[in-house]
From Swiss-Prot:
Organism encoding this protein: Caenorhabditis elegans
UniProt key word Cytoplasm: yes
Main location (coarse class): cytoplasm
Description of how the protein assembles with itself and partners: Oligomeric complex that consists of at least the alpha, beta, beta', gamma, delta, epsilon and zeta subunits.
Lineage: Eukaryota, Metazoa, Ecdysozoa, Nematoda, Chromadorea
Membrane topology (UniProt): Peripheral membrane protein
One of the GO biological process terms: endoplasmic reticulum to Golgi vesicle-mediated transport
Protein name according to UniProt: Probable coatomer subunit gamma
Keyword Membrane: yes
Length: 870
């Protein structure tokens, strides 16, 4: 402690400038006799400090220090002994032969001194390996149910850490853990519930029972109730058919006497997917009550949660606007920022200017993290009130010019880009602000992002030539990465603006003298395309880019080179396509408001190597497309099966991911048998699962050849076949060698047209449409009886055909009774497929009709695709 004013003035962090060598030298004092407890405590604290600061200590040095620490066991000083336990835990990872202190720790763990026992348990579990764990198992069981709460908690928390090393041993302590959950001590009950959940985490049915049991038997600990709410929330999210009683339990916690539990329950309810406004209203009311709490932390948590909810349910949060208005002048800037941004998301259009003026007054005083919250609120606001972009855009531009982190600048740039893409009236102003930004941008990733946007959007503005100066400045002044992106942007101007093409060619010729070969190569390539003025080449190689899988392209080229036959040129059509061009940045959702999450098709690359390694499928060639995971069983079934369809040029491989949830069974020779009632589809090679133990996931495969009739859709029956061997649930060892055969009926396997089509967007749909000609054009008109409005019809036709919308044509303006969507993709084999679908609502009976035109460079492909909707 500081005893006088002088100590206070010279005080500071005594550990600030520690030298590792000096500390290890001082550690030799541990060998002195008699032991100076005060001095050794100070040295140990230094040693622990440098380890926790990430200082690297060699194993020899650490082992020498560790052996010195072990000699301190001779001291009876309580403070020194507790420091010894901490030092043992820290040195355990970097020292050799730490096992020598096992007997000393075990003695302290089972001794009468309660002050030592808890710390000894933590240290012992830190150094114990899987082989030694069984020797202390009896002591751990006793410690878990010990009457001393500190000892019980330390044993339970140590067991949670041991779950990572030897989960099977810890699972045997379930009875003791269950008893500890009944403890009167709040922390013991909380820790015991956490361990009990981890023990049962792999058994969904057991987790559901755990929630049901403790939701009825009121837990005393508010910490445990909060943890139970989190478990219940996960059950609701994971289950396909959630139990209503679980939701009722969470809702009942809104009336708990603990403020912490009330907030946790409210946060859980509003974070659940697919909740209705009536379901979240009680949670909103609870959060509104938390806003009046005298504790700043509770107010902050409530306002932050309301801020997140306002994005998805702005109308539900409007009832809190009066309370949120009071927080605008809150001295805590974090609370004030969250309150204002929430009001921006929920308030009326007339209040926007007033709120923006208030937040402009202190936006420079808050951290970048909260500035990003402000930016997100502006993004949401521009979606609700598009006309307010005249107020928002200058504010964003001012924020963009201020100092800030990369994430902060990225959030602003993404918001401006989203506004430009959503609101045509804001395009010119937004592009002007971004041009000004890249004049003095220190982040290459953001510069290339903006240059890509300029190349795509600026040629469509009334005065495209005004942007060329900003782009060419990047060629002169920036890094190689940015210069290359600028060259590509210039080429896109030349491709789309014929009157500017001669000027662009002059600029590209200057780029031929660049010091970097990437820039020179791009300039040479684009100059050749523009000079020849072949619109087909310009469309395919400048505007759309090469839309293939990078790893698939590499693998196909290697296969071509290894074949040794170069009489025919390399065919790009054998390369798997991708929705994103190689030259474009990662696909980003540009919408101003968050969309509902959709299951995404897995990337082809992880499966390509796996399938190529299976001899039966190695000759099929590259994977064209992989589907999303499709459930063929209920999630709570004894055996769960998910299917992934992998489409090749002339065949389809069905991958069945099987999981055994029965802990008393070992499944052998697991396979999926397919049967086509029409007799068109035939199963080829199959790969079965030899062994499927409890809790593990393995894959079986079946090959389907596309029928000679040309059919590309159908439904097949599926049956899971396997042999069952009974095993001991605890050890997993077989009870005997006897097996018996069993079957399990799965959901039907559907093969659709969309499985043979990969959606690939065209940046210039009109040029691509004209380039295909009219030789392979098919047209149909029909009624849509299963959809209720135009947006649903657009979404449905895109899913059925497997095509993706182009030029943001899937966004239907509100109130329109007729809309045309442009769709594009590639059919397996590399054949382009384009579609124009016009959807109209009959004003008399509100029925929906659709006229669809399909174009392809192969007539048979056009026939197959149109058959999917007829």
């Amino acid at each position: 402690m500081k005893t006088n004013k002088k100590d206070e003035e010279t005080g500071g962090n005594v550990y600030a400038h520690l030298d590792k060598t000096s500390v290890l030298q001082e550690a030799r004092a541990f060998n002195e006799t008699p032991i100076n407890a005060r001095k050794c405590c100070f040295i140990l604290s230094k040693l622990i400090y440098i380890i926790q600061q990430g200082e690297s200590i060699g194993r020899t040095e650490a082992t020498e220090a560790f052996f010195g620490v072990t000699k301190l066991w001779q001291s009876k000083d309580v403070s020194l002994r507790r420091m010894v336990y901490l030092a043992v835990k820290e040195l355990a990872e970097v020292s050799d032969d730490v096992i020598i202190v096992t007997s000393s720790l075990t003695k302290d763990m089972t001794g009468r001194e309660d002050l030592y026992r808890a710390a000894a348990i933590r240290a012992l579990c830190k150094i114990t390996d899987t082989g030694m764990l069984q020797t202390i198992e009896r002591y751990m069981k006793q410690a878990i149910v010990d009457r001393n709460s500190a000892i019980s908690s330390s044993a339970i928390v140590s067991s949670i850490h041991l779950m990572r090393k030897s989960s099977e041993v810890v699972r045997r302590w379930a009875n003791e853990v269950q008893e500890a959950v009944s403890s009167d001590n709040h922390m013991v009950q909380y820790h015991a519930l956490a361990l009990l959940y981890q023990i049962r985490a792999n058994d969904r049915l057991a987790v559901n029972k755990l929630v049901q049991k403790f939701s009825k038997n009121a837990l005393r600990s508010p910490y445990a109730v909060c943890y139970l709410i989190r478990i219940a929330t996960r059950c609701l999210v994971d289950d396909d058919q959630p139990d209503s009683s679980v939701f009722t339990f969470i809702e009942s916690c809104l009336r708990h006497k603990s403020e912490m539990v009330v907030y946790e329950a409210a946060r859980a309810i509003v974070s659940l997917p697919q909740t209705t406004p009536s379901e979240i209203q009680p949670a909103i009311t609870a959060l509104q009550m938390c806003c009046t709490s005298p504790k700043a932390a509770v107010r902050f948590a409530a306002v932050r949660t309301l801020n997140k909810v306002a994005m998805a349910h702005p109308n539900a949060v409007m009832s809190c606007n009066v309370d949120l208005e009071k927080f605008i002048t809150d001295p805590n800037r974090s609370i004030a920022t969250l309150a204002i941004t929430t009001l921006l998301k929920t308030g009326a259009e007339s209040s926007v200017e007033r709120l923006m003026q208030q937040i402009a007054g202190f936006v420079n005083e808050i951290s970048d993290e909260f500035k990003i919250v402000v930016v997100d609120a502006i993004r949401s606001l521009c979606s609700r009130y598009p006309r307010k972009h005249t107020v928002m855009m200058p504010f964003l531009a001012k924020m963009l010019r201020s100092d800030g982190s990369y994430d902060y600048k990225k959030a602003i740039v993404e918001t401006i880009i989203a506004i430009i893409e959503e609101n045509p009236d804001a395009k010119v102003a937004g592009l002007a602000h971004l041009c000004e930004f890249i004049e003095d941008c220190e982040h290459d990733n953001l510069s290339t992002r903006v240059l890509h946007l300029l190349g795509r959007e600026a040629p469509k503005t009334p005065n495209p030539s005004s942007y060329i100066r900003f782009i060419y400045n990047r060629v002169i002044l920036e890094s190689t990465k940015v210069r290359a992106a600028a060259v590509t942007a210039l080429a896109k101007f030349g491709a789309q603006c014929v009157d500017l093409r001669p000027s662009i060619q002059v600029l590209l010729k200057r780029c031929l003298l660049d010091s970097d070969d990437e820039v020179r190569d791009r300039a040479t390539f684009y100059l050749k395309m523009l000079t020849e003025a072949a619109e087909g080449l310009i469309h395919n190689f400048i505007l759309d880019g090469l839309q293939v899988s990078p790893s698939g392209l590499e693998r196909s080229i290697l296969d071509y080179l290894r074949s040794g036959s170069y009489s025919s040129p390399f065919d790009l059509r054998v390369v798997p396509v991708t929705q994103q061009a190689l030259s474009q940045p990662e696909k980003r959702v540009p919408q101003l408001v968050e969309e509902e999450e959709k299951p995404k098709a897995p990337k082809v690359e992880p499966y390509a190597a796996q399938l190529a390694a299976i001899p039966q499928f190695a000759a099929l060639g590259p994977v064209f497309k992989s589907s999303t995971r499709i459930a063929l069983t209920e999630s709570i079934a004894e055996y769960t099966v998910h299917m992934i369809k992998h489409t090749f040029a002339n065949a389809m491989v069905l991958q069945f991911e099987c999981k055994n949830t029965m802990n008393d069974q070992l499944l052998l020779d697991v396979s999926v048998e397919l049967e086509d009632p029409d007799g068109e589809w035939e199963t080829g090679n199959t790969v079965q699962i030899d062994k499927l133990p409890y809790g593990e996931v393995h894959s079986a495969f079946s090959l389907l050849e596309f029928p000679d009739s040309g059919a590309i859709s159908g439904s097949l029956g599926a049956i899971l076949k396997f042999k069952v061997m009974d095993v001991d649930p605890t050890s997993g060892e077989p009870d005997s060698d006897d097996t018996y055969e069993q079957t399990y009926v799965l959901e039907e396997v559907d093969v659709n047209v969309s499985d043979s089509v990969q959606g690939v967007a065209k940046s210039s749909f009109g040029s691509a449409w004209e380039a295909l000609g009219d030789d392979a054009t098919r047209e149909e008109t029909f009624q849509l009886s299963t959809v209720e409005n135009i947006p649903d019809a657009v979404k449905k036709i895109s899913e059925i055909l497997g095509l993706v919308p182009c030029e943001r044509s899937d966004r239907v303006p509100e109130g329109k009774t007729q809309h045309t969507v442009f769709l594009s993709g590639v059919f397996r084999g590399g054949y382009d497929v384009l579609s124009k679908a016009t959807v109209a609502v009959d004003p008399n009976d509100n029925s929906i009709a659709m006229n669809i035109i399909i174009k392809s460079n192969e007539p048979l492909v056009a026939d197959l695709v149109i058959s999917a909707v007829v």
